[in-house]
């Protein structure tokens, strides 16, 4: 059923306006013995009126497979996400984007409305801030105490374009658990993630990129891990 819905969403995006579709593939690994290889494919479109749609599918190495540091091995579904949003531009500097994200796994659905504000400080520098609460329904826990996790994330971004075709960005995300499962990192009810992204606009279609992030490695200790990502975006 999920595959049918994803196929329908992709077909709708492509058929509406093939000149404004972006396809983004990304591979991820962490600095651990297992490496935690993951992949995701994102297809998105922003209409001329500001309305946008995106669909994302994710894969990860099966938890039952203990083969260390082997990408694309025993991959299984790692969830899907569909996002609908609308960008309203006040002027050439300020814009606001309300949206809604539905993230689904094999035993849960995560409902995440959000609001993002963006400012183009200069032609090369932009900043953004997003507030996104989450309401995660754990269908796998029906009949148990914890069937709903609630909280929110605050995400700040700063992006700078240099040498015409290069863009470097820094992202800081703060996640807070308020009810249900609230232990997120180091026995605390919050978690912080840092991420740096460097992209290169090869031409009007291709944009490869690399990312390096610092993420929590445990819910009960102060362990931190380095996360590496490499990907490419194709727009047509």
UniProtKB/Swiss-Prot annotation:
Subcellular localization: Cell outer membrane
Keyword check for Nucleus: no
Pfam family, one: KdgM
Record's keyword terms, sorted: Cell outer membrane, Ion transport, Membrane, Porin, Signal, Sugar transport, Transmembrane, Transmembrane beta strand, Transport, Virulence
GO biological process, one term: pectin metabolic process
Induction annotation: Induced by pectin or pectin derivatives. Controlled by KdgR, ExuR, PecS and catabolite repression via CRP.
Domain of life (superkingdom): Bacteria
GO CC, one annotated term: cell outer membrane
Transmembrane keyword on record: yes
Example of a GO MF term: voltage-gated monoatomic ion channel activity
Signal sequence residues: 1-20
InterPro entries: Bact_OM_Channel_sf, Oligogalacturonate-sp_porin
Function: Porin specific for oligogalacturonides. Also required for full virulence.
Subunit structure: Monomer.
Protein family per UniProt: Belongs to the oligogalacturonate-specific porin KdgM (TC 1.B.35) family.
Protein name: Oligogalacturonate-specific porin KdgM
């Amino acid at each position: 059923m999920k595959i049918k819905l994803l196929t329908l969403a992709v077909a709708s995006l492509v058929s509406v306006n093939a000149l404004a579709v972006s396809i983004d593939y990304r591979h991820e690994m962490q600095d651990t013995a297992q490496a935690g290889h993951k992949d995701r494919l994102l297809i998105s479109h922003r209409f001329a009126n500001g309305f946008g749609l995106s669909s994302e599918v994710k894969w990860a190495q099966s938890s039952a497979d203990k083969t260390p540091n082997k990408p694309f091995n025993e991959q299984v579904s790692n969830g899907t996400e569909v996002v609908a949003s609308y960008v309203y531009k006040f002027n050439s500097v300020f814009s606001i984007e309300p949206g809604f994200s539905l993230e689904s796994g094999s035993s849960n659905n995560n409902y995440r409305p959000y609001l993002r504000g963006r400012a183009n400080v200069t032609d090369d520098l932009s900043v953004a801030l997003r507030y996104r609460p989450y309401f995660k329904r754990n269908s796998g826990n029906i009949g148990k105490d914890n069937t709903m996790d609630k909280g929110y994330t605050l995400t700040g971004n700063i992006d700078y374009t240099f040498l015409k075709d290069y863009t470097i960005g820094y992202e800081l995300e703060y996640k807070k658990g308020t009810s249900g499962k609230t232990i997120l990192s180091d026995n605390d009810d919050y978690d912080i993630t840092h991420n740096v992204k460097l992209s290169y606009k090869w031409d009007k279609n291709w944009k490869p990129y690399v990312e390096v992030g610092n993420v929590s490695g445990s819910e009960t200790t102060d362990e931190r891990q380095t996360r590496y990502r490499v990907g490419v975006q194709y727009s047509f």
